[in-house]
């Protein structure tokens, strides 16, 4: 059955604004690409989540799907770098390598490849000294088993399976008397750093602890290219694409779940306060799936600049070339509008962990969407579809595009977002500080 058989009306405005990130030429290019796809039917039934396997963790781990290593925070700041194409990956530092080797089934372990993102903790520079200092920092490591296949399709070493490791870095900020804890998930490549830091500071000022995902899991941006040889290959190829997107999104959920278990052991007081999640851009796209892994654990969620249908976002986004994570190569096939739409529909029918499907699990939960009316990075139309899939929760629409949403509007909205969290997650009142007395 066609995944988008019945066109749905677009609910968001895509009127160009005067902001540079939404100039007329950019919109014309976007509209030309967008016309090559049939619109997504937001009324389709949801697929049940299918969570990919990970190698089981050793006894005593905080997570059934991996291990966690506490890190030397140095000055509490970090740098992020992508692995260049064709560059050999150096093994990580000894404690991380040893922890990964403790996972059963990792006799042959490979690390991240081209375009993957790696974090390194560093001393703060002159412009970083006003950053919040974390209470702790750590990395979650999981491993996925696979077999090396030779040119004839046979398993090369059948008795020694290979495993690929993925890392996700976190820091924790906690006030003296926490009223809640917020998972803060960034956009691609750990951005926008300044707005993430501002949000963390506003939350901390209101006695809300912050578990900050430094960046998406290391393989989230790893380069993968899919070649479409002909129309007949589309169903199988769509399943493969959906598997890659699903695996990367699931890792976000697994890492967040493990991170909470880890910090609850170090800070037991955090286990008894409400938990919320905030996602920016790519973090907003994956937020429904992160919450879908353990929906009862979260009291509320905030989606800033998010959308659904990951493959279509990767095709339409004006950030696609810069990110260079998932590339669809049509080879000698002429990519007609029908072929593109067929692939988009087939992908959705094979992608149970796309937020298009996991959003239905969150219906009835307090969700706030903050969305730009003319977003070309996470297309507004796909944000509209996510809003419908979530059951049309509270939504604040802002003029302009993706950059103006985060750098023009979000700084003004931070206090209102925090107030929304306090109300929606039903946080206890902050204690009234006693007034100073002049009496002896």
Model-identified regions with their sequence ranges:
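Gly/Ser-rich "nucleophile elbow"/oxyanion-hole loop immediately N-terminal to the catalytic nucleophile
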Residues: 235-281
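Short beta-strand/loop motif that positions the catalytic acidic residue
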Residues: 362-363, 368-371, 375
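Histidine-bearing beta->alpha loop at or near hydrolase active sites
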Residues: 398-406, 411
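N-terminal targeting or regulatory segments adjacent to alpha/beta-hydrolase or S9 domains
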Residues: 4-159, 206
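Short beta-strand element of the alpha/beta-hydrolase
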Residues: 169, 178-187
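Cap/lid segment of the alpha/beta-hydrolase catalytic domain
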Residues: 188-254
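Hydrolase active-site cap/lid region
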Residues: 288-340, 397
């Amino acid at each position: 059955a066609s995944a988008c058989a019945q066109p749905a009306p677009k609910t968001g405005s895509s009127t160009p604004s005067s902001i540079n990130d939404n100039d007329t030429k950019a919109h014309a290019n976007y509209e030309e690409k967008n016309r090559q796809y049939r619109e997504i039917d937001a009324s389709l039934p949801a697929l049940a989540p299918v969570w990919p396997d990970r190698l089981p963790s050793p006894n005593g781990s905080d997570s059934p799907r991996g291990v966690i290593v506490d890190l030397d925070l140095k000055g509490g700041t970090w740098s992020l770098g992508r692995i260049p194409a064709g560059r050999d990956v150096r093994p990580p530092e000894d404690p991380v390598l040893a922890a990964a080797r403790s996972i059963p089934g990792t006799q042959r372990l490979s690390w991240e490849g081209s375009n993957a993102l790696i974090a390194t903790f560093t001393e703060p520079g002159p412009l970083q000294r006003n950053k919040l200092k974390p209470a702790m920092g750590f990395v979650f490591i999981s491993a996925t088993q696979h077999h090396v296949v030779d040119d004839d399709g046979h398993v090369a070493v059948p008795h020694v399976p290979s495993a690929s490791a993925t890392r996700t870095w976190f820091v924790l900020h906690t006030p003296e008397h926490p009223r809640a804890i917020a998972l803060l998930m960034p956009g691609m490549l750990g951005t926008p750093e300044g707005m993430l830091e501002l949000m963390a500071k506003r939350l901390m000022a209101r006695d809300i602890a912050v578990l900050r995902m430094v960046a998406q899991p290391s393989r989230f941006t790893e380069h993968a290219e899919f070649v479409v040889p002909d129309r007949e290959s589309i169903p199988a190829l769509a399943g493969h694409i959906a598997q890659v997107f699903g695996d990367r999104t699931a890792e976000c959920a697994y890492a967040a779940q493990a991170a909470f278990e880890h910090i609850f052991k170090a800070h037991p007081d955090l286990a008894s306060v409400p938990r919320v999640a905030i996602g920016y851009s790519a973090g907003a796209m994956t937020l429904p799936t992160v919450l879908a892994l353990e929906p009862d654990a979260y009291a509320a969620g905030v989606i800033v600049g998010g959308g659904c249908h990951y493959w279509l976002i990767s095709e339409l986004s004006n950030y696609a070339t810069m990110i260079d994570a998932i590339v669809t190569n049509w080879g000698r096939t002429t990519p007609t509008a029908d072929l593109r739409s067929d692939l988009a529909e087939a992908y959705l029918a094979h992608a149970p962990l796309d937020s298009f499907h996991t959003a239905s699990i969150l219906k009835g939960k307090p969700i706030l969407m903050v969305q730009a009316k003319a977003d070309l990075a996470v297309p507004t139309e796909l944000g509209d579809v996510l809003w419908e899939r979530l059951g049309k929760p509270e939504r604040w629409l802002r003029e302009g595009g993706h950059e103006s949403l985060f750098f023009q509007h979000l700084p003004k909205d931070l206090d209102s977002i925090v107030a929304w969290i306090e109300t929606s997650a039903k946080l206890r009142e902050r204690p009234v500080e006693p007034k100073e007395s002049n009496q002896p």
